[in-house]
Amino acid sequence: WGLYAIPGGEWKGKVYNGAAEWLKSWAKVPAADWLELMKQWNPVKFDARQWARMAKEMGVKYVKITTKHHEGFCLWPSQYSQYTVAQTPYRKDILGELVKAYNDEGIDVHFYFSVMDWSHPDYRYEITSKEDSIAFSRFLTFTDHQLKELATRYPTVKDFWFDGTWDASIKKNGWWTA
């Protein structure tokens, strides 16, 4: 769940078939245009308790919640990014609401976390220069901070599932394999 839910698979009248969460990349949407979607993010009908009750009724034992997808939009008020739900009209900590609701129903919570982050200025698809290396090092520090923040803020979460790790910058970096 992220800003990509607002346009779905359509941008400026063109429909992009496939996963809506890839729209920013496929449509080559400029960062400033994509950030404008934050002004619209306001899921006022969202009810974490209702989701958790329905999951329990269906016999669900665990859920995997997207903390942020490749677009970098955080569903928690991260102190390391301004690209979060806290900067939207909704303002509430969606992850916190979901974790509490599912835990209250006895359902284990696991987190999905995209290492790739299209919104971060220091993210690099590959490292081709010393400047890239320095920038990517800053990005890895940012990522470490976000992961520690999530683990500390939501201590009942059982594990993390990492996505977006196929770029050369990540594959060739010892940070990821450490």
Predicted regions and their residues:
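Mature catalytic domains of secreted/periplasmic carbohydrate-active enzymes
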Residues: 1-178
